[in-house]
Amino acid sequence: MAMVSGRRSTLNPDAPLFIPAAVRQVEDFSPEWWQLVTTSTWYPDYWISQQQQGADGFYDNGENENGGGHIDVADLLPESFDFDDMEDFFDTDAAEFDQGFDGRMYYQAPSEFGFGKNGEMVKKSSGNRSPRSIVEPAKYAEKPAKWGNQRVAAAPRNIHQPR
């Protein structure tokens, strides 16, 4: 509007964005907060900028208890590892199954190393209890030849039309 009338604008382009007090007082992760995040285009950016500026260190870049220094990962590791307790993390029943490329579960017998009688993978069927082969025969045979039913001696007939 200022350009149309020829007058200069008195608005400050460097002024901070006006945020209503009701929006500033919304509790984080409340239903009202979630509604603001999902419906407004500016509120997620505003909320993240407020969390970065906060004194709680939510997004403080490198500032922590040791005066802003880096955390030594070796201090976070335990003194020793007890490998006897690690067996609880591995499920022996789940080790019998292997996922294929299409996300299906394949039964892998220890003696077969994942292969069936003819060398193909064996898929565990969820419907019945017997494993079946991945490679299934085609439902339909190949398309028959176009001129397969004609006699050998007969040639294609030309249609003669008068001029």
UniProtKB/Swiss-Prot annotation:
| Domain remark from Swiss-Prot or TrEMBL | Contains a PAM2-like motif, which seems to be involved in the binding to the PABC/CTC domain of PAB proteins.
Which InterPro entries does UniProt cross-reference here?
CID1/CID2
- Name the chain's protein: Protein EARLY RESPONSIVE TO DEHYDRATION 15
Give me the Gene Ontology terms describing cellular component.
cytoplasm; cytosol; thylakoid membrane
- Which processes are annotated in GO (biological process)? cellular response to hypoxia; nonphotochemical quenching; response to bacterium; response to high light intensity; response to water deprivation
**Phenotype caused by lack of the gene:** Hypersensitive to abscisic acid (ABA) leading to improved tolerance to both drought and freezing, as well as impaired seed germination in the presence of ABA.
Main location class: cytoplasm
Q: Where is this motif: PAM2-like?
A: 10-20
As recorded in Swiss-Prot or TrEMBL, the protein's gene is named ERD15
Q: Where is this region: Disordered?
A: 118-163
Q: Where in the cell is it found?
A: Cytoplasm
UniProt keyword annotations, A-Z = Cytoplasm
The source organism is Arabidopsis thaliana
- What does this protein do, in the record's words? Central component of stress responses that interacts with poly(A)-binding proteins. Negative regulator of abscisic acid (ABA) responses, including resistance to drought and freezing as well as stomatal closure regulation. Mediates resistance to the bacterial necrotroph pathogen Erwinia carotovora subsp. carotovora and promotes the induction of marker genes for systemic acquired resistance (SAR).
